[in-house]
């Protein structure tokens, strides 16, 4: 048997890969095996010519997050309630008990990233600047579209974990009506949370964000290079209560991102409740 294990996972043709969760048996801990595996996988990703690597550490503890930060990764998104409550390490303390489990999205560019010129609503400019600064990428904002044209392109998927994924590849003139109908259909199927993504290079992003917020979606983060090599904006909608303060978060930059998401969620809830 092996005392540890880790792997790079990449979709066919993708320019990025996920560094899968590394596992070290208890008897072999304290020998820097986790750090050495991480370094080896980063070297392999560079050999493959990838643009970057990402990881999705849990928030029930900070061990994986600590390793990701040591490897130069920055937090770019927080996915709340995307795993069942029982999806926790066996035999470990569970400070997040009583709610579905959440994951971080950590990312590291393996080469100097090109400057980003994106479309985003003004209320998200500051947090987006901070995320891209942490990632080491220059950022500028484009003027929003005066009007949308054509039809939307959207893909919908329901995961066994109870998450409904809504992926816009193009934002068209009917996006607000389309999104409301999609959300209604997925909620009727009993999903526990909804995830929304759209390419930040689409001029219709501010319109989509307005429509999404009207449906109850709040900011979740950015997925660099996830949209056929381009970056995607991420938003979320939760069906069940979730206390962000229960999440175990290691780095100050990650805590700042989580605080913004918590604030955006509260602001949206107050607005939609008429407060």
What are these regions (language model features)?
Residues 1-27, 154-165, 169-175, 183-184, ...:
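A conserved beta-strand-loop-helix scaffold within acyl/acetyltransferase catalytic domains
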Residues 1-5, 100, 229:
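Glycine-rich acetyl-CoA-binding "A-motif" of GNAT/NAT acetyltransferases
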Residues 1-5, 207-210, 215:
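Conserved beta-hairpin
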Residues 24-26, 30-47, 52-55, 175-184:
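Conserved acetyl-CoA-binding loop-helix of GNAT-fold acetyltransferases
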Residues 45-59, 67, 189-199:
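Conserved GNAT acetyl-CoA-binding A-motif
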Residues 54-56, 72-95, 218-230:
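Conserved catalytic-core motifs of GNAT/GCN5-like acyltransferases
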Residues 119-149, 248-275:
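Short, cationic low-complexity segments
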């Amino acid at each position: 048997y092996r005392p540890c294990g880790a792997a790079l996972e990449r979709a066919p043709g993708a320019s990025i890969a996920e560094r899968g969760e590394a596992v070290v048996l208890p008897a072999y801990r304290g020998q820097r095996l986790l750090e050495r595996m991480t370094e080896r996988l980063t070297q392999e990703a560079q050999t493959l010519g990838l643009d970057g690597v990402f990881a999705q550490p849990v928030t029930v503890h900070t061990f994986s997050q600590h390793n990701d930060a040591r490897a130069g990764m920055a937090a770019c998104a927080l996915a709340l309630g995307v795993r069942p409550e029982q999806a926790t390490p066996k035999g470990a303390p569970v400070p997040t008990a009583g709610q579905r489990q959440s994951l971080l999205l950590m990312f590291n560019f393996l080469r100097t990233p090109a400057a980003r010129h994106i479309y985003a609503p003004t209320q998200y400019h500051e947090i987006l600047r901070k995320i891209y600064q942490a990632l080491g990428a220059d950022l500028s904002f484009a003027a929003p579209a005066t009007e949308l044209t054509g039809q939307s392109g959207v893909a919908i998927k329901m995961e066994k974990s109870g998450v409904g994924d809504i992926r816009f590849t193009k934002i068209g003139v009917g996006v607000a009506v389309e999104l409301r109908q999609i959300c209604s259909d997925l909620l009727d199927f009993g999903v526990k949370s909804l995830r929304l993504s759209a390419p930040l290079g689409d001029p219709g992003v501010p319109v989509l964000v307005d429509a999404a917020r009207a449906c109850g979606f709040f900011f979740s983060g950015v997925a660099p290079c996830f949209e056929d090599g381009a970056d995607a904006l991420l938003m979320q909608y939760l069906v069940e209560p979730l206390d962000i303060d229960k999440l175990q978060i290691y780095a100050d930059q990650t805590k700042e991102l989580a605080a913004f998401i918590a604030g955006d969620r509260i602001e949206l809830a107050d607005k939609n409740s008429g407060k």
